[in-house]
């Protein structure tokens, strides 16, 4: 069914969100249906996973996600079970995530790039030079969150075109050519015109 996703710009703040995450990729399969972010297409989660927010604080120069050390693992705030009810054994993976918070001039709220809604568009300078894409005149590397995946607008396309897409306009009111398709067989197809992602499949 055709739909439209209105794009909005997000930019990093000087704040980070710290979370505790436990997950296990072996053993019984987790078949819960999840919507990983606002506007996302629901999907089946294949493994047991739970994450809880711990704090929001100012950025530090040495911020980085990491496996929890022995002292951190004793914290009582770690999730004890997956939302499906599966109880984590004591030896599962424990990760401390430290993610930058983003905000938008067009929309209220703050998000990390882990949970930013569909329609969010941002500059990803850390991707420049990693895939051979041609730099754009505004020196931005645009990424757009769609209902299915993160579209690297300024990256190469999966069909082998290293130049990727062409775009005009000022973010988030950009027009991109050609269209975007996702999946094999195709799960999504659409056009980005003047800051609106017009999805014609599904």
Regions found by a protein language model. Name each.
Residues 1-141, 149-202:
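A short Gly-Trp-Pro
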């Amino acid at each position: 069914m055709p739909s439209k996703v209105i794009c909005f710009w997000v930019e990093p703040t000087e704040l980070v969100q710290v979370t505790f995450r436990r997950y296990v990729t072996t053993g019984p399969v987790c078949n819960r249906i999840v919507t990983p972010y606002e506007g996302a297409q629901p999907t089946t989660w294949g493994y047991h996973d739970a994450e809880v927010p711990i704090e929001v604080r100012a950025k530090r120069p040495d911020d980085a996600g990491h496996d929890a050390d022995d002292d951190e693992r004793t914290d009582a705030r770690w999730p004890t079970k997956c939302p499906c009810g599966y109880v984590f054994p004591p030896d599962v993976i424990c990760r401390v995530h430290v993610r930058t918070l983003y905000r938008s001039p067009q929309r209220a709220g703050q998000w990390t790039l882990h949970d930013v809604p569909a329609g969010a568009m941002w500059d990803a300078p850390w991707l420049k030079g990693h895939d051979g894409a041609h730099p754009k005149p505004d020196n931005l590397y645009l990424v757009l969150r769609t209902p299915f995946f993160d579209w690297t607008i300024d990256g190469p396309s999966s069909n082998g075109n290293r130049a990727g897409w062409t775009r005009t306009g000022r973010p988030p009111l950009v027009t991109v050519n050609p269209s975007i398709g996702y999946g094999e067989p195709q799960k999504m197809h659409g056009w980005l015109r003047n800051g609106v992602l017009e999805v014609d499949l599904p």
